Amino acid sequence: MIRIAIPNKGRLYEPTISIFKDAGLPISGGAESRKLFAKTTDPDIHILFARAADIPEYVQDGAADVGITGIDLITERGAKVETLLDLKFGKASLVLAVPEDSDFQKAEDLEGRKIATEFPEITHQYFKKHGVNVEVIKVSGACEMTPHVGIADAIVDISSSGTTMMINHLKPIETVFSSTVYLIANKESLRTKEKILDIKTALESVLNAKDRRYLMMNVPESSLQAVKEVLPGMSGPTVMKVESSKLPGESILAVHAVVDADLIFTIVNKLKKVGARDVLVVPIERIMP
């Protein structure tokens, strides 16, 4: 059995549920039902709901074989786990922020000052790298209030949009750490449980497909070379003969290719100009690596 620890709430919960569904491993039930455990469509893969901050240690200690959580939390805990895959969601930054009416402009301006944070290890390492001596004060929440009540001169805290800091009259002056969500594994489990790599492959296939589209078109044989020059594709387009052509005496070919989504507008217009017709653009659910 493989036990996967995933966030039980917060901004990481819904994207995690979604990517498992897209990967063909939908989770039955959810944390909203107050359950600690859930099943997937694979009887050998079970889900454990946990606080995102606790998941690195759960995986390190073997309570879970696999986990999904932010790389910031993994780094802060110093967890001895294998990082398998950047899932590319849950993007956030740990920022150094000061009161908006202060004169602090950079980390060096905070020599000898107090810094409040929920990430003391990352914060300590950041200031050490800059050669700045500060007093790091660990807090468990409401970090934004600490400069306004005299507890700290600045904070290091997670910022996704900057709205919360703006509301609390704080201004970011430096980015301390950039984070996304990662798939991690227990070292021993990874060595002994082959299905962990199957899970990685399934999730990776969703990421591979996310920003790509499948193009299908009919092309006169005389235009094939021009069409091939337009299409970047993954490993060149697939070309097949169309048995029934509406144009007597002219062979029609079906051409299929996978292209980046942000190139679709440009590529389709170029294809039409060189003779492609009946162009279809289709979403891709998964591309297996």
From Swiss-Prot:
Keywords: Amino-acid biosynthesis, ATP-binding, Cytoplasm, Glycosyltransferase, Histidine biosynthesis, Magnesium, Metal-binding, Nucleotide-binding, Transferase
PROSITE patterns: ATP_P_PHORIBOSYLTR (PS01316)
A GO cellular component entry from the record: cytoplasm
Pathway: Amino-acid biosynthesis; L-histidine biosynthesis; L-histidine from 5-phospho-alpha-D-ribose 1-diphosphate: step 1/9
Subcellular localization, as worded in the UniProt entry: Cytoplasm
Domain of life per record: Archaea
Catalytic activities: 1-(5-phospho-beta-D-ribosyl)-ATP + diphosphate = 5-phospho-alpha-D-ribose 1-diphosphate + ATP
A GO molecular-function descriptor: ATP phosphoribosyltransferase activity
InterPro entries tied to this protein: ATP-PRT_HisG_long, ATP_PRibTrfase_cat, ATP_PRibTrfase_CS, ATP_PRibTrfase_HisG, HisG_C, N-reg_PII-like_a/b, N-reg_PII/ATP_PRibTrfase_C
GO BP of this protein: L-histidine biosynthetic process
Purpose: Catalyzes the condensation of ATP and 5-phosphoribose 1-diphosphate to form N'-(5'-phosphoribosyl)-ATP (PR-ATP). Has a crucial role in the pathway because the rate of histidine biosynthesis seems to be controlled primarily by regulation of HisG enzymatic activity.
PANTHER family from the UniProt entry: ATP PHOSPHORIBOSYLTRANSFERASE, ATP PHOSPHORIBOSYLTRANSFERASE ATP-PRTASE
Similarity remark: Belongs to the ATP phosphoribosyltransferase family. Long subfamily.
Protein's UniProt name: ATP phosphoribosyltransferase
Taxonomic source organism: Methanosarcina barkeri (strain Fusaro / DSM 804)
